[in-house]
């Protein structure tokens, strides 16, 4: 398969099933070169009311879609330095009462602070030796489930 001049081919990726609650509207951002930013809006009574992922396309940031109820501004965000090949290795999710309550992002360089609420049981989206290149999940009143696409790590330069 040929690639248009000036564009990078998308990595081969494995889809890790969404975890968390059931039901709600399913969304899928697909596969990208990488993730550049993550934004969340905390729910007024717990959970994550909305989430947005910005991605990397042809080495440049590309705005993603907002998933959920974006009735206010995002309350927390996490920027990745994709120009220095910072990439997400795992996402630790806090889950309670049928909703994702919070996230902790681990990259090859650092780990984020809690985003949202650190209550409930945890699960981790992670595949050893791979990086996250896209997200999918579902929403009802708040974020109910989260899954990810994983691609092989680039060889060290």
From Swiss-Prot:
Function statement: Confers broad resistance to potexviruses. Inhibits virus accumulation at the cellular level.
Reported tissue expression: Expressed in stems, leaves and flowers. Not detected in roots.
Matches recorded under PROSITE patterns: JACALIN_LECTIN
Segment forming the signal sequence: none
GO MF terms held by the record: carbohydrate binding
Keyword terms: Lectin
Gene source species: Arabidopsis thaliana (Mouse-ear cress)
Superkingdom as given in the UniProt entry: Eukaryota
Name of the protein in its database record: Jacalin-related lectin 15
CDD domains reported for this sequence: Jacalin (cd09612)
Segments traversing the membrane: none
Gene3D superfamilies linked: Jacalin-like lectin domain (2.100.10.30)
Induction statement: Not induced upon virus infection.
PANTHER family: GENOME ASSEMBLY, CHROMOSOME: A06, JACALIN-RELATED LECTIN 3
Keyword Acetylation in record: no
Family classification: Belongs to the jacalin lectin family.
Domain Jacalin-type lectin intervals: 13-152
Pfam families tied to this protein: Jacalin
Entry keyword tRNA processing: no
